[in-house]
Amino acid sequence: MALAAADRATVRALWKKMGSNVGVYATEALERMFLGFPSTTTYFLHLDLSLGSTQVKAHGQKVADALTLAVEHLEDLPRALSALRHRHVRELRVDPASFQLLGHCLLVTPARHFPGDFSPTLHASLVKFLSHVISALASDCR
């Protein structure tokens, strides 16, 4: 099921507000996930996971690019994210629970940076968006 028009507009407005800093916020969410949920680091043993590491920043930018792609294709997330889903589920064998944990951290980050804008409506729309993204990524796990 696709997001409602109001939710799509709300998510797109947040993305516009984040502007060129989406990578910075995605990196912060990754760092938060690694600190708060250490089990997620098992997929990244080959990276320097210290705060501010260039490798984490590079992966944060990949997350940001994937989420931006999702925002640009809100009407058909499964198709837009199919290559990413295949890589993470089939090749990397990422536990679907890790998507949930990152989703939580991605929700916290804009709330921290935009507290005045983080209304119940924005919160609900972002939860729905992230749930759709997570569902699209984890759909091959079923």
Curated annotation (Swiss-Prot):
Heme b binds at residues 59, 88. Belongs to the globin family. Residues 2-142 form the Globin domain. The lineage of its organism: Eukaryota, Metazoa, Chordata, Craniata, Vertebrata. GO terms for molecular function: heme binding; iron ion binding; oxygen binding; oxygen carrier activity. GO terms for cellular component: haptoglobin-hemoglobin complex; hemoglobin complex. Pfam families: Globin. It comes from Equus caballus (Horse). Keywords: Heme, Iron, Metal-binding, Oxygen transport, Transport. GO terms for biological process: cellular oxidant detoxification; hydrogen peroxide catabolic process. This is Hemoglobin subunit theta-1. The gene is HBQ1.
